[in-house]
Amino acid sequence: MARKNAQAEDLSNVEFETSEDVEVIPTFNAMNLKEELLRGIYAYGFEKPSAIQQRSITPIVKGRDVIAQAQSGTGKTATFSISILQSLDTTLRETQVLCLSPTRELAVQIQKVILALGDMMNVQCHVCIGGTNLGEDIRKLDYGQHIVSGTPGRVFDMIKRRVLRTRAIKMLVLDEADEMLNKGFKEQIYDVYRYLPPATQVVLISATLPHEILEMTSKFMTDPIRILVKRDELTLEGIKQFFVAVEREEWKFDTLCDLYDTLTITQAVIFCNTKRKVDWLTEKMREANFTVSSMHGDMPQKERDEIMKEFRAGQSRVLITTDVWARGIDVQQVSLVINYDLPNNRELYIHRIGRSGRFGRKGVAINFVKSDDIRILRDIEQYYSTQIDEMPMNVADLI
């Protein structure tokens, strides 16, 4: 997979190629899926599989170990959700699949996608995350859950307490594996793995493939199929990107107020770089009598869930947040993203913006830039070979 002499450096830049025997299956119909799963996929609004879905679903369903290098916005969650649902034996009321992810939000998101796609299959899927009631976990797991989606610490705790029985587990999914390692979950992932039956199939999804990840794949996997979704398939296509030049930081606020009526045509997400800025901006918008909701990593879990629920249901139309939201949280109606602050790195840009026009849905992104930000913006533009123009007056017509 990597040239030997590259072992010492970060392997994320090594040419990671898709395995030669990977077939591209162009439609969901051609994947030989269960009838009720297929109906669930179409009911969810999917029409055509994304690049990663065309390549990964079939090998996973066939039981192969798979390493997929893919970022959010590629349809990765639905990729393994569909594969899991196809592989399940719903008549067996035991945990057969375990999904681990780096954040509570993502674990919940995965559960929602699985339940939505498996709506006609009578599937049981439980979320196992910290900050929730232990008794509830025990009751739910006792009842029998086909799939458990959770964060590594809580899942390991449940296995150790023998509340989560692993004897029927046949698949382990590691989503955003690089993020899990960044958050220090390496030990817990290894701990969980040790409790699983030896023949467990492993599916690993990661945006980058640093040495630690490759080390993990060599320990957990047998002859894995590799699937790389190149960045050009992480689309900024169909997303119109603009910038508004402001001379001073304070002027961003006035610009946002001017845009408020445009924002509420659909639903909008506004990104700030810090939690303090989110709180400050939310407060200031409310003082000016604008209705907004906000979310960041310091809020209690319950509150974050509540806010996400309202936003998903369309009860709140403008959400101010930090990058905690940008990874893997999918709200289909969002067609406008505003970077109140330009992100601190190029990858975050596609995580924030690449959400709004998923799978052919159109979107608009507006970047607020001070003069010293223009350089960063041009760098982003070049990196993704995309175009970011000055915002036109009629921006409302584009949304």
Curated annotation (Swiss-Prot):
It is found in: Nucleus. CDD domains: DEADc_EIF4AIII_DDX48, SF2_C_DEAD. Gene3D superfamilies: P-loop containing nucleotide triphosphate hydrolases. Its main location: nucleus. Residues 57-227 form the Helicase ATP-binding domain. It catalyses: ATP + H2O = ADP + phosphate + H(+). A motif (Q motif) lies at residues 26-54. It is an enzyme of class 3 (hydrolase). The keyword Cell membrane does not apply. ATP binds at A70, Q71, S72, G73, T74, G75, K76, T77. A motif (DEAD box) lies at residues 175-178. Residues 238-399 form the Helicase C-terminal domain. GO terms for molecular function: ATP binding; ATP hydrolysis activity; mRNA binding; RNA helicase activity. One of its GO terms (biological process) is RNA splicing. Part of the mRNA splicing-dependent exon junction complex (EJC) complex; the core complex contains btz/CASC3, eIF4AIII, mago and tsu/RBM8A. Interacts with btz/CASC3 and mago. Interacts with ncm/CWC22. Belongs to the DEAD box helicase family. ATP-dependent RNA helicase. Core component of the splicing-dependent multiprotein exon junction complex (EJC) deposited at splice junctions on mRNAs. Involved in exon definition of genes containing long introns, including the rolled/MAPK gene. Has a role in oskar mRNA localization at the posterior pole of the developing oocyte. This is Eukaryotic initiation factor 4A-III. It comes from Drosophila melanogaster.
